[in-house]
């Protein structure tokens, strides 16, 4: 049984936003896909998709599904509209991936250590929970920049990181400003540019 978490991929990968498995032609090898309306689609709520029998089994036996409240019709209508829109529009996907590439280039130019990969999510390695929380707090309080800190138990101790995500809505100036602010904070707090990776 192959269960694939595509919450960060639906809407952003593939010709029609169908996710990584669909983009790579592997969807026929996946039994169940988990997605969310809370990221690329801009709403809330999650979903699973798969073979009818599998989805029916979840619907009938999964307590997390049985004892939850359904999404409101207005949210579902918005989700449907968003899915339909992103099936045909490539503007947002193209811009999001271009912005992710610019973010990585800007971080590289300043000497920051992040986990390299093809994803639009850029894990900026910090390696210390207190430092990670301090940086994200300062970014929000003093610079109006929200960055998600990722600490234990989500990741092992010593591998704490900031999860950076450049969206389609960000401009090149936004991205450069963020990296400049980050560089300033590292200098101000005497942090090494090459934190533990």
Cite the ranges covered by each PLM segment:
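Active-site C-terminal subdomain of aminotransferase-like
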Residues: 1, 8-118, 131
């Amino acid at each position: 049984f192959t269960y694939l978490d595509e919450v960060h991929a639906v809407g952003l990968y593939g010709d029609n936003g169908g996710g990584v498995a669909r983009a790579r032609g592997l969807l026929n090898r996946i039994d169940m896909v988990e997605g969310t309306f809370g990221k690329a689609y801009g709403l809330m709520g999650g979903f699973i998709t798969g073979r009818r029998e599998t989805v029916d089994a979840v619907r009938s036996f999964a307590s997390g599904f049985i004892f939850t409240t359904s999404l409101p019709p207005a949210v579902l209508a918005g989700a449907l509209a968003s899915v339909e829109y992103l099936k045909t529009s490539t503007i947002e996907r193209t811009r999001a991936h271009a912005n992710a590439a610019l973010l990585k280039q800007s971080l590289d130019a300043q000497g920051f250590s992040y986990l390299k990969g093809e994803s639009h999510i850029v894990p900026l390695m910090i390696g210390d929970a207190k430092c990670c929380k301090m940086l994200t707090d300062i970014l929000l309080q003093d610079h109006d920049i929200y960055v998600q800190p990722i600490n234990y138990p989500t990741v092992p101790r010593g591998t704490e990181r900031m999860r950076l995500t450049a969206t389609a809505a960000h401009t090149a100036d936004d991205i450069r400003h963020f990296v400049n602010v980050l560089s300033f904070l590292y200098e101000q707090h005497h942090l090494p540019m090459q934190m533990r990776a």
